[in-house]
């Protein structure tokens, strides 16, 4: 699967899509592939504040439990409730159906510090 050019990426394999003064966050195709079949996703509540580089949830696969690290700071304004009943969406549609949270940014400049698709591809040895 190709790496979408319209997103930014963290070194912890989260993607970020800018929508006005907010961002949508999910995990990358590379990350879901490393984790294997996702069986449970734990996400914060709407209204929670998340801090960049701090855990904001977790993803449980048949192999392991992995924490999700916030690529930016802000207030959670939406959570993808579908992942509660359909965690497999993370494997099936990491960039579309499996978005995890929408966050109102506290510092928009944090997005610019994230990796471009090209840099993320280099980091993960993907073309």
Curated annotation (Swiss-Prot):
Family label: Belongs to the GcvH family.
HAMAP family for the chain: GcvH
Lipoyl-binding domain location: 22-104
Modified residues (N6-lipoyllysine): 63
Pfam families: GCV_H (PF01597)
Subunit structure: The glycine cleavage system is composed of four proteins: P, T, L and H.
Chain's gene name: gcvH
Cofactor binding annotation: Binds 1 lipoyl cofactor covalently.
GO terms of biological process kind: glycine decarboxylation via glycine cleavage system
Gene Ontology CC annotation, any one: glycine cleavage complex
Organism: Bacillus mycoides (strain KBAB4)
Task performed by this protein: The glycine cleavage system catalyzes the degradation of glycine. The H protein shuttles the methylamine group of glycine from the P protein to the T protein.
NCBIfam families the record matches: gcvH, PRK01202.1
Protein name as catalogued: Glycine cleavage system H protein
Key words, A-Z: Lipoyl
Coiled-coil residues: none
Reported cofactor(s): (R)-lipoate
InterPro entries reported in the protein's UniProt record: 2-oxoA_DH_lipoyl-BS (IPR003016), Biotin_lipoyl (IPR000089), GCV_H (IPR002930), GCV_H/Fam206 (IPR033753), GCV_H_sub (IPR017453), Single_hybrid_motif (IPR011053)
